[in-house]
Amino acid sequence: MAQFGGFGGWSAMDVAAAAAAALGNVSGAVYHADPAAAVYASLVPGMAVVPGRAPPSAVQIEAARRWKELEKMALRSVNLMVTCAGAIQAGDYAAAAGSLSDAREIFAKMPTTRTGIGRVLTHFADALAERLFPAFPQSAPPPPPPRGEQRELFRGFYEAGPYLKFAHLAANQAILEAFEGCNSVHVIDFALTDGIQWPSLIQALAVRPGGPPFLRITGIGPHAAGNRDELRDVGLRLAEFARSCSVPFAFRGIAADQLDGLRPWMFQVAPGEAVAINSVLQLHRLLVDQDAAAAASFPAPIDGVLDWVASMNPRVFTVVEQEADHNKSSLLERFTNSLFYYASMFDSLEAISRHGGGDGAGNPLAEAYLQGEIADIVSREGSSRVERHEQMPRWVERLRRGGMTQLPLGATGLWQAAMQLREFSGAGFGVQENGGFLTLTWHSQRLYSASAWRATAGKKMTMMASGAADAMEESQNSNTNGGGGGSSGGGHGALNQIMQ
């Protein structure tokens, strides 16, 4: 089992088991921690007494003693932070503040919180502190980082490990297979960001037997800030790359803050185009509290988006999401589940660093990226909480209910993902095929799952009336906007069409 480099052999499973033990409940169904699988080494690596060998030296014995002290400190910290989360949930803020203060006192005595369990617990303590002592009024949640900083964090996380690389490869392979034999293809990307996913697809289409198709990409992204139109900038870069690969290409950007505000007519799908819709780590942002969803009489945002996705009848709808359970209404359950998950994430980042000859500190941008997710999960509630990760079984149920049928990600995708992980072969990553899905794993912990879908045949028929209504709405908007392209958010449309 993988171990944190900074704190005496503590693994991600150890963190989860300790958190569950603090609650007096180690049910795997709730906390995903199997106590039997937790490993608590009693000696520093290399300290085991083997017959025929010399007994441990005084230096080794002292190291073991210090290690045991650190182990006790880490366990005590986990217990205090779980107690803090439980007190917050119960409304006992004085007790919560006391537990958090005690945990921070322990952190101050630790030799380092740059690596290992100390680093993970520090991020969770910061999130609890933000929950207890918000720096902003309750009516105004903390604003997201500036857009330039968000891009930098995204790029840092992408480069730090196989996480987003796996997501893009699995999705692109499914799209490539869906476009086989098509001469005009259209990719709709729910979150274009810096367009880093698409050069590899363009390259694959360039060498396709029979020649490349005409490729159109519609990217959804933020509104232009100041004098800079980020969507257009990304489109220009993609157009130049497609030109270098001799792939006929067009780009269109749609500025939108919420996916549930979009409608099919906005994408201007041409007759005869084969459509692929791509969602990487975006659908969970459309979810609401599980308890609230069960009690609500109106559909959640995710339901409306899945309806119009199905109505567009794409050849493939690619979905990649965190393989995690962070959408519980209970803060205590969210806290323990996320502590387990992010302990594995930071463990894997440290292993990558050490595998590459580093000190285990890892990529600071990737750390900040994950820290932002932790803060959202732990410190925010209601509409301000967007990192609502759920596990694949719930996504399967939701997507099928939304009129989608699963397309298996076959052996080719599995082989390519495994080949991509060769760079990290010594770090403990793997790829599993689970019922047609591909899952990136860190030892036994599942991190991200990729899946592919298409509209169910019966659903297509029920959506015909919706399609006619969309066509009428498109006509009305074209008349209102003077034929400006029908993109949401204004400022994008004909001006954001970039063609080779």
Swiss-Prot record:
Q: Does the keyword RNA-binding apply?
A: no
Region: VHIID, residue numbers: 154-219
Q: Where is the GRAS domain?
A: 68-454
Q: Does the keyword Repressor apply?
A: yes
Q: Where is this region: Leucine repeat I (LRI)?
A: 75-135
Record's InterPro entries?
TF_GRAS (IPR005202)
Its GO biological process annotations read: gibberellic acid mediated signaling pathway; regulation of DNA-templated transcription
Which keywords does this Swiss-Prot/TrEMBL entry list?
Gibberellin signaling pathway, Nucleus, Repressor, Transcription, Transcription regulation
Q: In which tissues is it expressed?
A: Expressed at low levels in leaf blades, leaf sheaths, rachis and flowers. Expressed in the embryo of immature seeds.
Motif VHIID location, chain numbering: 185-189
Per the record, the major location class is: nucleus
Under Pfam families, the record lists: GRAS
Chain residue ranges for the region called Disordered:
466-500
Report the superkingdom from the record.
Eukaryota
Name its cellular compartments.
Nucleus
Induction entry: Induced by treatment with gibberellin (GA3).
One example of the protein's molecular function in GO is:
sequence-specific DNA binding
**What are the start and end residues of every segment in region (PFYRE)?**
275-376
| Residue numbers spanned by region Leucine repeat II (LRII) | 233-265
| Protein's job | Probable transcriptional regulator that acts as a repressor of the gibberellin (GA) signaling pathway. Its repressive activity is weaker than that of SLR1. Its overexpression prevents the GA signaling pathway and induces a dwarf phenotype in Arabidopsis thaliana plants.
Q: Which family, according to the similarity comment? A: Belongs to the GRAS family.
Name of the protein in question: Protein SLENDER RICE1-LIKE 2
